[in-house]
Amino acid sequence: MLTRCMGRAFRLSTFFALTTAVTLGIFVISSVYLAHNGIKLPWTSAKIEEGVAHYSVDAITALAITIIAAIPLTAVTERFAKNGELRAYYISFSLILLFFAAVMILLFVNTCSLCSSSCSVRECGVEIALFNAEISCVCQ
């Protein structure tokens, strides 16, 4: 009984940690994308110089929002898993990863179209660290 309870607690905490980590990535990348498109969010800051835009996301706010988002998702998934549907963990996490992939594709595929300048773009790129992102556009 104790082993089964500990196994469930380990499974639940691992799922919560993974869900929070991936949700954090989705949140940061989405915030940068929205900030670059002119939608000012309270937790983002921008600095633009010579064709390079630097965006930062407030770490405390990002962690708080992603933890708040991960709690109900973990609770719903655990409820399904209690009924003997352990595949609920796999299905739920797979959906989160698919959404993460869609957000990444949205940002990286449209990088050059994100460059808002009147000149023709010769080179463009995106660099993402944990809470910082840089979108660079070099004109011809």
Curated annotation (Swiss-Prot):
Keywords: Cell membrane, Membrane, Transmembrane, Transmembrane helix. GO terms for cellular component: plasma membrane. This is Uncharacterized protein AF_1249. It is a multi-pass membrane protein. Its main location: membrane. The chain crosses the membrane at residues 12-34, 54-76, 89-111. It is found in: Cell membrane. It comes from the Archaea.
